[in-house]
Amino acid sequence: IEMPWHKLDVVTFSFQKGLGGEGGHGVLILSPRAVERVNSHVPAWPVPKIFKLHKKGGLDTALFEGATINTPSLLVIEDAIDALSWAEEIGGIEALLKRVDTSFVHFMDWVGASPHFEVLARDPATISPTALCLVISDDWFTAQPDEVQAGVVKSMLALLEAEDVAVDINAYRDAPTGLRIWGGPTVDPEDIASLLPWLDWAYETVRADLQDGSLHGDG
């Protein structure tokens, strides 16, 4: 995602997301203004060593020159370097952004045509182009009790996994019942485009099975 760097003083990100790496490691970026703040601010309370950026009257620059707070996994670091090398090979940040944009266009075009799904976010300004979150909007589904809705999604996920189409696309734990697809730059946009019709198929298959059995919806 393009970042409004002129508005940002401190940015953190994990290797896990855009680089498809380990979730327990990440990067801290400080703007010149943030560095000035670190140099001049004296905390009113004790700060744990692992969180200290200030040392001997100024910014602890060793943290930004390769010094480690704790012993990292070198395999994780090599994996991140490998991901950066791949990103450079395909065209750098511009290519990564294009992959995300293309996947998002595929996603939104499909949502606009699907009779069963809507994006989770109600405000278009809050729709994430990378965490592609869906809810099922079909009238039959929304008329079912919560436990049935959860069962429908669980059955859909099992079908998709059995067909080697998708794994681990359940909604976030605290989000409404639905699906969550990662549309970051490490995912081929054509894979996103190929996945989406399968979601309609999985829902229609599970709904038909339930309607033909003990559950009967309105549609």
Which residues make up each language-model segment?
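Glycine-rich, mobile lid/loop segments that gate access to catalytic sites or pores
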Residues: 1
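Conserved active-site segment immediately N-terminal to the catalytic lysine
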Residues: 4-16
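Active-site C-terminal subdomain of aminotransferase-like
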Residues: 16-110, 123
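Conserved C-terminal alpha-helix-loop-beta "cap" of PLP-dependent enzymes
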Residues: 112-197
